[in-house]
Amino acid sequence: MILEHRKQEERREDHSKRVVKERQLEANLSCEDRIERKRLLRKLQDEEYGKQIEESLLRAEEDKLFRERQLEQEERMAKELARINNEKLRDEKMRQYIKENSVELRELELKLKSAYLNRERAAQMAEKEAMRYETLREEAMIARTMRDEHELAEMEKEKLEQKKYEEVVRYQQELERQLEEKERKRQEAYEEFLKEKHMVDEIVRKIYMEDQMELQLQLDKMKATQRYIEDFKKQQAEWRRMEREKVEAENRRIIEFAQYQQRKEEDRMAKVREREQAKETLHKMLSEQIELEKQQREKMERAREELCLEEQAEAARQQEIEEMEKRIRQRLELQQTQQEMMAFKKLRLQEEKEEEEAFRQMMMAKFAEDDRIEQMNAQKRRMKQLEHKRAVEQLLEERRQQYLAEQEREEQERAVELEREAQRRKIIEEERQRLLKQHATKLLGYLPKGIFKEEDLEHFDEDFKSNFKQRQADIFSDEGWGDDSQ
């Protein structure tokens, strides 16, 4: 389009130049040459008009050709797009049909679903285990709280008993202080008595010194006083004996009370030891019971898990057996179909040979009958027979060519079927790789054995490869330990 536009511009410029040139020529021409100039000008105009008409026709033809080429190109592009869309749609339909009817993909999907179930079951078991540990922790906290409260109550009780014991000690000390106070007062009374006695002795001595004459009287008085003193000493001795007995009795009561307190303290400590022993025994029994229940729960969980795994394995084995029986039946049916096809083909070949022979005999008989009807001579009859034979051979050759064409068509159909089977296997493998890439990273550690081929790991990153190999090594090591323990 740009080239045509440029050509038109050039043509307009040439035309303008020619017009200017013509006008200049007209201006320079003399009057007597005006007619000639007009004639020449008309001729030039006619030529210019003819050129314009020719150029218009050429442009119209070029535009037509351009539109035709553009239309053809658009039609080719539309056909190509339609072909691509049809192939894409056909490929999608084929993929969808293969995905829905492929035994391998159904087995892979069942294995992936089983892996998801295993992961969900493991998560549920982990959650149950966490809940069980949380329950045990709460029970341990409750037992610890009860033990702390019991110890606090025992401490409070011990404090009360200690307080009572301290009060008893204070009472004993107060009693001893009172006894000491009594002893001090008694000693003061005795000293007062000694002072009085000393005063009496002094009075007696003065009396004795002042009045010897009255000695006999005073002697009697002194005897009386002596008796009084002896009575006083006897009373004092009796009072001291009674005080001593009282103190001894008080000491015995204090000792008995102390012994009673000691026995009570020993009984309390024995009860505390018995309670501690009973508490330890109860704690040990609870721990053993909790451990036994834990082992029983773990045993039940393992048994349940083993039973579930055995059921899954049995279901998988049953499914594999059913699929194997199905494949065997399909293979037997295919073999039977092939045998029937071979027998049918053999029978058809035999029938075709018989039909050819019957057709040959029929044609020869017909030709012979025609010959007899025409009552030809021997030479013409031989010529006619040769013509008939060539016609029959030509018909047989046409039938052989038709048979070969059918054989070639069957070979082409088998090749197409093989190509279709290869395409189906390719689609199955691509879909299998897609499912593995989509789900394997989420189900690492829960995938069943045999789901991966050796070349499948090449489609994953290094992290997945290392984790997968580590999981496999752990599984093999666990199996080895299990064998050793057995």
UniProtKB/Swiss-Prot annotation:
One of the protein's GO biological processes:
meiotic cell cycle
Locations listed in the record? Nucleus; Cytoplasm, Cytoskeleton, Cilium axoneme; Cytoplasm, Cytoskeleton, Flagellum axoneme
* Record keyword Chaperone present: no
What are the alphabetically sorted keywords of the record? Cell projection, Cilium, Coiled coil, Cytoplasm, Cytoskeleton, Flagellum, Meiosis, Nucleus
Primary place of residence? nucleus
Could you tell me which Pfam families the record lists for this protein?
TPH
- For the keyword Cytoplasm, the answer is yes
Q: Which InterPro entries match?
A: MNS1, TPH_dom
Give the UniProt entry's GO cellular component terms: axonemal microtubule; axoneme; motile cilium; nucleus
Residue ranges that the Swiss-Prot or TrEMBL entry lists as coiled coil: 52-198, 230-440
| Family to which the UniProt record says this protein belongs | Belongs to the MNS1 family.
Question: Which function does this protein serve?
Answer: Microtubule inner protein (MIP) part of the dynein-decorated doublet microtubules (DMTs) in cilia axoneme, which is required for motile cilia beating. May play a role in the control of meiotic division and germ cell differentiation through regulation of pairing and recombination during meiosis. Required for sperm flagella assembly. May play a role in the assembly and function of the outer dynein arm-docking complex (ODA-DC). ODA-DC mediates outer dynein arms (ODA) binding onto the axonemal doublet microtubules.
Q: What is this protein called?
A: Meiosis-specific nuclear structural protein 1
State the encoding gene: mns1
